[in-house]
Curated annotation (Swiss-Prot):
InterPro entries: UPF0767. The keyword Manganese does not apply. Keywords: Membrane, Transmembrane, Transmembrane helix. Belongs to the SMIM12 family. GO terms for cellular component: membrane. This is Small integral membrane protein 12. It is found in: Membrane. The chain crosses the membrane at residues 15-34.
Amino acid sequence: MWPVFWTVVRTYAPYVTFPVAFVVGAVGYHLEWFIRGKDPQPVEEEKSISERREDRKLDELLGKDHTQVLSLKDKLEFAPKAVLNRNRPEKN
């Protein structure tokens, strides 16, 4: 009798294993939710670093008066000396 049983199980293995795996998975799923309990309260998401940076920059912009800027005539240099005169020792 056992050899016939094992031959049938081996022949129809896909048809046997799927329902068994389904039952084991369903029991495990419900057991996990039973052990875990109720759903935890959703945690309020924190702002990302880039969002906090944007908010900070906007706050800084709101505090400034954008009509008071230096004219181009008042600016003596457009680039720092160190960049333009790096390879010219006679100008240092």
